[in-house]
Amino acid sequence: MANITTQGYHDEVTFPMIVRGTPPATLRGVLTLSTCSNVCLLTDYPFSVTPTVQNADFAHDYARAMGKIPLRSGLTDSLDVGYRPGELVVTATRAAGWSSPGLYLDTIDDVDFAKPRLRVEGDRLQATVPVTDSWGEKAPDLRNKSLTLVLADGAIAQEST
């Protein structure tokens, strides 16, 4: 299908878990993810994890996994989001500059976000995102709608609403 843009993770995903209380002998569940090529489909992945005794590497491994969760602050010095019909504009500054920026947007009902166009000028990142309705036609009105986004630069990410 033409004009479909997908975003997300590639090659590796980490899901840190905290089990409170006495852990079961085996933790089982089903993880449902959308997998995409030309079309996105929901796929169920049954899993089974046998809890192990914490070894010397546990604290390091746990801290590493938790470090991959987007922060609430700390990546950007300032963040501004604006909207004009058909276009979302995200502007962020970062004193350390931008080396490998990325922008990921949560979905909003009946709104499609196209692939962001990123432009870096020194410590300033500007992302322009074309916006259409679910049919790829008219631009919806995003005023007064809540939007959650993740800005990333390399291994550091920040989630903002």
Residues covered by each model-derived region:
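Extracellular/lumen-exposed scaffold segments
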Residues: 1-161
